[in-house]
Swiss-Prot record:
The gene is CRBN. Belongs to the CRBN family. It is found in: Cytoplasm; Nucleus; Membrane. Component of a DCX (DDB1-CUL4-X-box) protein ligase complex, at least composed of CRBN, CUL4A, DDB1 and RBX1. Interacts directly with DDB1. Interacts with KCNT1. Interacts with ILF2. Interacts with TRAF6 and ECSIT. Residues 68-306 form the Lon N-terminal domain. It is a peripheral membrane protein. Substrate recognition component of a DCX (DDB1-CUL4-X-box) E3 protein ligase complex that mediates the ubiquitination and subsequent proteasomal degradation of target proteins, such as MEIS2, ILF2 or GLUL. Normal degradation of key regulatory proteins is required for normal limb outgrowth and expression of the fibroblast growth factor FGF8. Maintains presynaptic glutamate release and consequently cognitive functions, such as memory and learning, by negatively regulating large-conductance calcium-activated potassium (BK) channels in excitatory neurons. It comes from Pongo abelii. Pfam families: LON_substr_bdg (PF02190), Yippee-Mis18 (PF03226). GO terms for biological process: proteasome-mediated ubiquitin-dependent protein catabolic process; protein ubiquitination. InterPro entries: CULT (IPR034750), Lon_prtase_N (IPR003111), Lon_prtase_N_sf (IPR046336), PUA-like_sf (IPR015947), Yippee/Mis18/Cereblon (IPR004910). This is Protein cereblon.
Length: 429
């Protein structure tokens, strides 16, 4: 069964395979109220509720060399902090995971820019934090929830006699840059500086006014240089995070600052994991070793790449950035695994176009409990784009939305916004 074969209901009849053009999206509107429990998708309840959970974490020293086993069937560019659900059937993989559970529970996920690529240069360590074994018709199945930990550079790949790949990797460090004003400020006064936390809301007028004054004073030392204040703000982590948060609030109006990481490194990875970009751009983000540089690149992508097209057709627009909304605590996009073991990073949008629906709605193995899914294909090339989700109860909101798989989407710059062609996207690196 191919990796891109969509999940279909178990009882498929000939009449269920009918292909119809979707008409609902033409009248679709952004839901004003969402009463869906956004914690359900992140818990991956479709894997089962009785998974054995592990605590603690395994972190390797920066620049250290490690030998880590590789899960070969995971064709995904994992971002640190991103959750990776897995269903493993092959005896080799089942045996490998069992051994990992007895050790440090860490395996390597290699970052391939495409399926044809034979050797990966970068990747991410993944640590198992939930585990379950079961049997289905005599076949042993392992269900796993893992989380990305650290970036690495691949030094060597070798295959053992049992067929398991071992990767010798170098753990990549995170470069923490000093404040943009550090070069012109007196070091003796650094300990006297006050960095107030940003107020959660504007209701606390006193704190908010103090915050505004702090923001104005933040770059006052720029007057001592030949460069303007705004130039320094372009490389200030706090300023970059605020600009990205404004973009994220367009996807989730109820987004709260305390639900996002306050650390620039963790925040940059959180944003990278929910950006609907192709593998080429994602590997570029994974290679970057500085949170500030990563944030600048992410903000550039969010501002420029406002259209999402079919990756196969390249010119057939499926949706736009304005249609994205969040239905999960992780944000508008997260990774889910289907019963065949294939992982789909799925983006939620409330409107999509140029799609045909295949078959009838099914609630089997639904990633969003309470919603039935229908396979969606590109109207032009018939490639699998994702699913249409429809509510099974009338009191649920939203009543319908789309889940688009990231691997089928190509981020592009609309011609009206930029003269560059999609294959000449210049990112702020």
């Amino acid at each position: 069964m191919g990796n891109h074969l969509p999940l279909l209901p178990a009882e498929s009849e000939e009449e269920d395979e009918m292909e119809v053009e979707d008409q609902d999206s033409k009248e679709a509107k952004k839901p004003n109220i969402i009463n869906f429990d956004t914690s359900l998708p992140t818990s991956h309840t479709y894997l089962g509720a009785d998974m054995e959970e592990f605590h603690g974490r395994t972190l390797h020293d920066d620049d250290s060399c490690q030998v880590i086993p590789v899960l070969p069937q995971v064709m995904m560019i994992l971002i640190p902090g991103q959750t990776l659900p897995l269903q493993l059937f092959h005896p080799q993989e089942v045996s490998m995971v069992r051994n990992l559970i007895q050790k440090d529970r860490t395996f390597a996920v290699l970052a391939y820019s495409n399926i044809q690529e034979r050797e990966a240069q970068f990747g991410t360590t993944a640590e198992i934090y939930a585990y379950r074994e079961e049997q289905d018709f005599g076949i042993e199945i392992v269900k796993v929830k893992a989380i990305g930990r650290q970036r690495f550079k691949v030094l060597e790949l070798r295959t053992q006699s049992d067929g398991i790949q071992q990767a010798k990797v170098q753990i990549l460090p995170e470069c923490v840059l000093p404040s943009t004003m550090s070069a012109v400020q007196l070091e003796s006064l650094n300990k006297c500086q006050i960095f107030p936390p940003k107020p959660v809301s504007r209701e606390d007028q006193c704190s908010y006014k103090w915050w505004q004054k702090y923001q104005k004073r933040k770059f006052h030392c720029a007057n001592l240089t030949s460069w303007p204040r705004w130039l320094y703000s372009l490389y200030d982590a706090e300023t970059l995070m605020d600009r990205i948060k404004k973009q994220l609030r367009e996807w989730d109006e109820n987004l709260k600052d305390d639900s996002l990481p306050s650390n620039p490194i963790d925040f940059s990875y959180r944003v990278a994991a929910c950006l609907p970009i192709d593998d080429v751009l994602r590997i570029q983000l994974l290679k970057i070793g500085s949170a500030i540089q990563r944030l600048r690149c992410e903000l550039d992508i969010m501002n420029k790449c406002t259209s999402l097209c079919c990756k196969q057709c390249q010119e057939t627009e499926i949706t736009t950035k304005n249609e994205i909304f969040s239905l999960s605590l992780c944000g508008p996009m997260a990774a889910y695994v289907n019963p065949h073991g294939y992982v789909h990073e799925t983006l939620t949008v409330y409107k999509a176009c140029n799609l045909n629906l295949i078959g009838r709605p099914s609630t089997e193995h639904s990633w969003f409990p309470g919603y039935a899914w229908t396979v969606a294909q590109c109207k032009i090339c018939a490639s699998h784009i994702g699913w249409k989700f429809t509510a099974t109860k009338k009191d649920m909101s939203p009543q319908k939305f789309w889940g688009l798989t990231r691997s089928a989407l190509l981020p592009t710059i609309p011609d009206t916004e930029d003269e560059l062609s999609p294959d000449k996207v210049i990112l702020c690196l």
